[in-house]
Swiss-Prot record:
Broadest EC class assigned to this enzyme: transferase
Misc remark: Attempts to disrupt both the Rv3032 gene and glgA in order to create a mutant simultaneously deficient in both alpha-1,4-glucosyltransferases turned out to be unsuccessful. Thus, M.tuberculosis H37Rv requires a functional copy of at least one of these two genes for growth. Moreover, it is not possible to inactivate Rv3032 in a mutant lacking treS, suggesting the joint essentiality of the different alpha-(1->4)-glucans biosynthesis pathways involving these two genes.
Species: Mycobacterium tuberculosis (strain ATCC 25618 / H37Rv)
Metabolic or biological pathway: Glycan biosynthesis; glycogen biosynthesis
Catalytic activity: [(1->4)-alpha-D-glucosyl](n) + UDP-alpha-D-glucose = [(1->4)-alpha-D-glucosyl](n+1) + UDP + H(+)
Keywords for the protein's UniProt record, in alphabetical order: Carbohydrate metabolism, Glycogen biosynthesis, Glycogen metabolism, Glycosyltransferase, Transferase
Protein name: Glycogen synthase
Length: 414
């Protein structure tokens, strides 16, 4: 099949797990013989005169990175304007698709959108080429904000999500919990939803057994620095852990809008010197940290899947996670990791303590987690299942959509 993948993240532009997901899915589909074109973007803030649109084949995938138009929008301050400008640049690039190295046009059999930020280009291109549109919903605005859609920007994002979901001919989620979430938020009358878990290339994350600890315990968080990730709970748990395990440290790897606030939280809990913010790490640096850490701590309040949990499991790092959403499906409590309820600082501290107090049991769980990856989270399996969704998707007749009322507490059970 000829697949047009539309994503606001694709290497080297990677913000979080979405970019890694699209990369691995695209390369796995290409390896299976499909003709894959990824439509993405140049890095934010780049000048089109020095960073023009590019069209290259990497790992068997044709990647078109649309240049950023010369505007003054920033993602942090002008998110919706920035997103619309990005979408406009993507549409222009998508309308000019030619078969690589020729003047012949290239026409997709399906358009695959990844999240609301590419709703406008994906919907426009699927309509232009008159082909089915499949959308993977990686997260929702209501989910990220504990069930609430409050404020102008959140309402705008939620409305675009609703539009994307209702324009889709087929939908994919990476966990059963996300299936339930988008059905509750946007149903009834949606296209068929298929749950396809994330995968992992375990060979890139070699397993390393923990060596007997000779010094203070080292904990590791990896991910975006956003409120819904619950990093502040790990910081709040650190003083409790240092009372029973003196010298315990927490390394925080990642970037995000809440870094300054998290530093304030570490100062508030008097663990700033025991907390290390290392920013974004390359693969080699991250792997070294995973191999050294006594536990990977992922205390999310909201997590549609949790790709970092798979990466830590592959590397052999004992897992301590919340049992929310996709994390509750990716980690089997007591078998492949230790889980606790989200927002439960005392429970999180107790879960980490159980890992530190019984390293042999932690190693048994780590080995079981690695073994499970090979059977349940293989990218070729993910690609095969995704291709089946493409084949089954049929472009439906479009009708004008009414503006739906937005319920402020959209997920009342959160």
């Amino acid at each position: 099949m000829r697949i047009l993948m539309v994503s606001w993240e694709y290497p080297p532009v990677v913000i979080g797990g979405l970019g890694r997901h699209v990369h691995h899915l695209s390369t796995a589909l290409a390896a299976a013989g499909h003709d894959v074109v990824v439509l993405s973007r140049c890095p934010s803030g780049t000048d089109p005169s020095t960073h023009p649109s590019s069209d290259e084949v990497t790992e068997g995938v044709r990647v078109i990175a649309a240049a950023q138009d010369p505007h003054e929008f920033t993602f942090g301050n002008d998110m919706m304007a920035w997103t619309l400008a990005m979408g406009h640049a993507m549409i222009r690039a998508g309308l000019r698709l030619k078969k690589l190295g020729t003047d012949r046009s290239w026409r997709p059999d399906v358009v695959h959108a990844h999240d609301w930020l590419v709703a406008h280009p994906a919907i426009a291109l699927a309509q232009f080429y008159d082909v089915p549109m499949v959308s993977t919903i990686h997260a929702t605005e209501a989910g990220r904000h504990s069930g609430w859609v409050s404020g102008a920007l959140s309402r705008q994002v939620h409305a675009v999500e609703s539009w994307l979901v209702r324009e889709s001919d087929s939908l994919i989620t990476c966990s059963a919990s996300m299936n339930d979430e988008i059905t509750e938020l946007f149903g009834p009358g949606l296209a068929e939803i298929t749950v396809i878990r994330n995968g992992i290339d375990a060979a890139r994350w070699p397993f390393a057994a923990r060596r007997p600890r000779t010094g203070p315990a080292e904990l590791l968080y990896v991910g975006r620095l956003e409120y819904e990730k619950g990093v502040h709970d790990a910081i709040a748990a650190l003083p409790r852990l240092r009372r029973t395990h003196p010298g315990t440290t927490l390394t925080i790897a990642g970037e995000g809008t809440q870094q300054d606030w998290l530093i304030d939280q570490a100062r508030k809990h008097r663990v700033l010197r025991a907390t290390r913010f290392v920013g974004h790490l390359d693969h080699t640096e991250l792997l070294a940290l995973l191999h050294r850490a006594d536990a990977a701590v992922l205390p999310s309040h909201y997590e549609p899947f949790g790709l970092v949990a798979l990466e830590a499991a592959a590397a052999g790092t004992p897992l301590v996670t919340s049992n929310i959403g996709g994390l509750g499906e990716a980690v089997i409590n007591g078998q492949t990791g230790v889980s606790c309820a989200p927002r439960d600082v005392a429970g999180l501290a107790a879960a980490v303590r159980s890992v530190l107090d019984d390293p042999a049991a932690a190693q048994r769980r780590a080995r079981a987690a690695r073994q499970r990856l090979t059977s349940d989270f293989d990218w070729q399996t993910v690609a095969t299942a995704t291709a089946q969704v493409y084949l089954a998707a049929k472009r439906g007749e479009r009708q004008p959509q009414p503006r739906l009322p937005i319920v402020e507490h959209a997920l009342p059970d959160r």
